[in-house]
């Protein structure tokens, strides 16, 4: 039996990951997020560090004494707002973006690695973005947070290798997916989001991938051990 922990599981890619893990059976699934859920869910608003820490406590409590072949964390939760030139955006939205997209994944990596110290193989899959690797007009917070997550992933991988620990870390850009986050991005004005017409065209042309297909690719690659190696990865290059 393996352990899978998924954040942001109420919609989009996270929901697809959680559904497919649950459907195949045989493994332990825990989800973390602010919406209420079933017995596999740990409720926490990832914008608040204190709630993330409490989620870490609950994770430790729930898996105490259990034996797992491997443990996998999918840091998937994310928000796109605020969108617009930096001087125009709301400070509270800016803070929330950085908290959800950057601070929470790092805190959860920390608690996950502590909680699973006795597991022979541990994997962290941080859902990154192409926006981590190129600037996008109007996305200062999102780009910065995802770029920071890329670097944090590289550091954690380096620390694991330097101590001879079986910890594999991937910061994975999944490509363009048909999710609520994409829909919200298309609602912005051209003044705030210079790429708005390109994003609308991608939707109109039908080139956004269904979240279920992307989740299936990610889970297959994880099962095959193909998310190891270079921590900075792009699903479109390895699927």
Question: Which residues does each predicted region cover?
Answer:
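Residue(s) in the substrate-gating loop at a strand-loop-helix junction
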Residues: 129
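Rossmann-fold cofactor-recognition segment
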Residues: 38-50
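Substrate-binding pocket helix/loop in short-chain dehydrogenase/reductase
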Residues: 84-86, 93-95
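Conserved glycine-rich Rossmann-like NAD(P)H-binding loop of the short-chain dehydrogenase/reductase
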Residues: 25-39
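Active-site helix of classical SDR
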Residues: 109, 145
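N-terminal Rossmann NAD(P)H-binding glycine-rich loop of SDR-like oxidoreductase domains
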Residues: 10, 14, 18
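C-terminal helical subdomain
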Residues: 167, 171-172, 179, 187-239
């Amino acid at each position: 039996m393996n352990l899978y922990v998924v954040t942001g599981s109420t919609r989009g890619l996270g929901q697809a990951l959680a559904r497919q893990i649950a459907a195949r059976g045989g493994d332990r699934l825990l989800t973390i997020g602010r919406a209420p859920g079933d017995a596999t869910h740990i409720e926490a608003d990832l914008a608040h560090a204190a709630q993330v820490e409490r989620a870490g406590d609950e994770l430790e409590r729930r898996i105490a004494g259990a034996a797992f072949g491997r443990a996998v964390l999918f840091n998937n939760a994310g928000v796109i707002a605020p969108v617009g030139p930096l001087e125009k955006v709301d400070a509270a939205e800016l803070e929330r973006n950085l908290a959800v997209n950057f601070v929470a994944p790092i805190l959860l990596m920390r608690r996950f690695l502590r909680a699973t110290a006795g597991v022979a193989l541990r994997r962290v899959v941080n859902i990154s973005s192409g926006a981590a690797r190129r600037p996008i007009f109007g996305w200062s917070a999102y780009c910065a947070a995802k770029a920071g997550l890329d670097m944090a992933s590289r550091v954690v991988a380096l620390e694991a290798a330097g101590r001879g620990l079986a910890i594999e870390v991937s910061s994975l850009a999944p490509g363009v997916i048909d999710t609520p986050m994409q829909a919200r991005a298309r609602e912005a004005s051209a003044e705030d989001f210079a790429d708005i017409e390109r994003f609308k065209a991608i939707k109109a042309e039908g080139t956004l991938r269904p979240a279920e297909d992307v989740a299936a690719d990610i889970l297959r690659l994880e099962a095959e051990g193909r998310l190891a190696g270079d921590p900075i990865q792009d699903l479109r290059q390895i699927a």
